[in-house]
Amino acid sequence: MKVCNLVEAYIAYRRSLGERYQSPAVMLRSFARYIGEDKECMSIDEKTCTAFLYSPNNTVSASWFLRYSSLKWMFEWAIVRGYMQEVVLPKEKPKALEHVKPYIYSAEELKRIFELALSYQKNKSKTPPRCVQAILKLTYVLGLRISEPISLQLKDLNLCEKYLVIRESKFYKSRMVPFNDQVVLLLNDFLGWRKAQGWSSDNETFVFLDKNMDRLSIDVVRNAFERIREMAGIKRTDGSRYQPRLHDLRHSFAVHRLTEWYRSGKDVNRLLNSLSTYLGHDHISNTSVYLSMTDDLLSEANNLFNAYRNGKVET
């Protein structure tokens, strides 16, 4: 059996089990192209697989482990069916990457990011700065994953009822995200600009487009954000190998919200479940990690605990 046929058969098998199997499918097809789609499965060797795992820069990245596990499962599936004889992968795996500690942006840093989003481009581009700015603002003020604003269609916005719909995001769940009057103003302002560009108002049209009328991609927005962050002079000083990321806007939203609740004397433990639902987490434990993420948050939590202990806050 040829590699391309093995990959497609395995993807079909995983999807027949009810799985979406999207990211691994992209990776496996990339593997087939890398080693040659017409290559016979029996001739796949460990050296070639190892080179693929470390490509393109011969380094260990987060994708290394996804590639390894996906290939391992496919090879084991192929062995049972007689398409291969062994798992041709390195016996030892590299040390797991250090956990990326989220960077929590300050109010001043957020202001610089949003302002520079309109002026970061040095040359003409098909990416409208107004779209980039609106995406970054929505990502922060609503605590979204970057894939979520990019995937929004006009039908997903309900400004009258003040909510938007996130359709089948992470964990394949849809959810409604309510917002306040400030977000209504933000969206109305952007949609007014969008209309002035003569873009389609069909409900199925994506909200954020480039000048070719194509949906903006995650990579385009991520690259734009990196330029904006560098122009804003925002960088880590804690020795971490990773600089502040686009996804940290979402983490900043969560931490800022929790800090605000503590400072106003709210019952954070009770509200944590609501925040978890709002963020689209599949388990509250994924949200509770924010409780110890910054010194400010820990300080506010300690102050509230002391107030309860001394009887200054009613229960």
For the regions a language model picked out, list residue spans one by one.
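Conserved catalytic core of the tyrosine transesterase superfamily
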Residues: 1-315
